[in-house]
């Protein structure tokens, strides 16, 4: 295994998880900023005597490459890696959306549009069979994972008409650069950002739910999708990590708390990393784990359906999900090296 972009938060979590993986060998990791320096220079919590290698060296040695790079870079590197016989798990947004949609929302010209048709969307709960043997995986982001898993049972039932989604994220979701996330600016502060339908994860959420509406429980990345619209407003919260999503779903038909819970428990029965709660989820219970905690709630007074979902943005929302995808790609037990229990307190 090799990691490009190992000096970002997602790269650090990949390092932590892959170093403990009993079935794979981490042969190298790169960072332009830390090349030639010891791992501990970037990550004092990790214990490893190796140095950050050159990107070219990692690409040459690794059989599977994780791209934990800024948007726009993976589309340049993935073709080279695939041509050399490597398999790729991309943590950026480069292969999650059709090229024309990507360009409209990310404002980056797509340099490898043909590869999008080969990429498999990396949400195992919905794409498990597709991921087995995949060469290129487009790993979803944290908000999208939480929102999709919160609403997927309603979409699969064919009753989802739309949703209003509010997301709350710890500051690590913004990456390692301190602009806008410095302690003095986020401490004792809560603020929305990219409101008014401008967040670039919106088309990914809509595409996911549209595929489920059209295809049902098990979906194909490039299969049929129905139109669905949702509103999404993210907020930055003064905590290090964690995502909490509250989705108010517009649904068809008559519902009760009992029927709603039964739908969710049936949909997620047997899923190793999704827990349907009786109470309300909280981010702290998921930290360090690859688990998503979900709670559907029928509001009898108004007849509304609310769904809450919590996860660790750096694990199930990023690196843990990437390792889950790796396990499926290689035919390994899906839960290998992935913690279900969180850290507490």
From Swiss-Prot:
The lineage of its organism: Bacteria, Thermotogati, Deinococcota, Deinococci, Thermales. The active site is at residue 142. SMART domains: Semialdhyde_dh. Belongs to the NAGSA dehydrogenase family. Type 1 subfamily. InterPro entries: AGPR_AS, AGPR_type-1, NAD(P)-bd_dom_sf, NAGSA_dehydrogenase, Semialdehyde_DH_NAD-bd. This is N-acetyl-gamma-glutamyl-phosphate reductase. Pfam families: Semialdhyde_dh, Semialdhyde_dhC_1. Keywords: Amino-acid biosynthesis, Arginine biosynthesis, Cytoplasm, NADP, Oxidoreductase. It is found in: Cytoplasm. GO terms for biological process: L-arginine biosynthetic process. GO terms for cellular component: cytoplasm. NCBIfam families: argC. CDD domains: AGPR_1_C, AGPR_1_N. Its EC number is 1.2.1.38. GO terms for molecular function: N-acetyl-gamma-glutamyl-phosphate reductase activity; NAD binding; NADP+ binding. Catalyzes the NADPH-dependent reduction of N-acetyl-5-glutamyl phosphate to yield N-acetyl-L-glutamate 5-semialdehyde. It catalyses: N-acetyl-L-glutamate 5-semialdehyde + phosphate + NADP(+) = N-acetyl-L-glutamyl 5-phosphate + NADPH + H(+). It is an enzyme of class 1 (oxidoreductase). Pathway: Amino-acid biosynthesis; L-arginine biosynthesis; N(2)-acetyl-L-ornithine from L-glutamate: step 3/4. PANTHER family: N-ACETYL-GAMMA-GLUTAMYL-PHOSPHATE REDUCTASE, CHLOROPLASTIC-RELATED (PTHR32338:SF10), N-ACETYL-GAMMA-GLUTAMYL-PHOSPHATE REDUCTASE, CHLOROPLASTIC-RELATED-RELATED (PTHR32338).
């Amino acid at each position: 295994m090799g990691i490009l972009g190992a000096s970002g938060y997602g790269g650090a979590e990949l390092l932590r998880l892959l170093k403990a993986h009993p079935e794979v060998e981490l042969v190298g990791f790169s960072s332009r900023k830390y090349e030639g320096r010891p791992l501990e220079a970037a990550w004092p919590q990790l214990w490893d005597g190796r140095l950050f290698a050159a990107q070219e060296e990692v690409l040459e040695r690794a059989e599977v490459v994780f791209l934990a790079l800024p948007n726009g870079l993976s589309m340049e590197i993935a073709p080279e890696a695939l041509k050399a016989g490597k398999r790729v798990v991309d943590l950026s947004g480069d292969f999650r959306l059709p090229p024309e949609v990507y360009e409209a929302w990310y404002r980056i010209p797509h340099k490898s549009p043909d590869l999008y048709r080969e990429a498999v969307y990396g949400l195992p709960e919905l794409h498990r069979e597709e991921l087995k043997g995949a060469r290129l995986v487009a790993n979803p982001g944290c908000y999208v994972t939480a929102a999709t898993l919160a609403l997927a049972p309603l979409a699969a039932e064919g009753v989802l008409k739309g949703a209003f989604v509010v997301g709350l994220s710890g500051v690590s979701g913004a990456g390692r650069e301190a602009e806008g996330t410095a302690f003095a600016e986020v401490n004792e502060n809560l603020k929305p950002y990219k409101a008014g339908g401008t967040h670039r994860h919106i088309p990914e959420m809509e595409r996911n739910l549209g595929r489920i509406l059209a295809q049902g429980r098990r979906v194909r990345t490039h299969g049929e999708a129905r139109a669905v619209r949702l509103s999404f407003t993210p907020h930055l919260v003064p905590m290090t990590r964690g995502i909490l999503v509250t989705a108010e779903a517009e649904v068809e038909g008559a519902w009760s708390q009992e029927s709603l819970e039964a739908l969710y428990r049936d949909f997620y029965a047997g899923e190793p990393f999704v827990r349907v709660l009786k109470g309300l989820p909280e981010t702290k219970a998921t930290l360090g784990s690859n688990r998503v905690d979900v709670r559907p709630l029928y509001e009898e007074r108004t007849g509304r359906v609310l769904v809450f979902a919590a996860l660790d943005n750096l694990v199930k929302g990023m690196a843990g999900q990437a390792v889950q995808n790796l396990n499926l790609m290689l035919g390994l037990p899906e839960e290998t090296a992935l913690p279900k229990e969180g850290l507490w307190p």
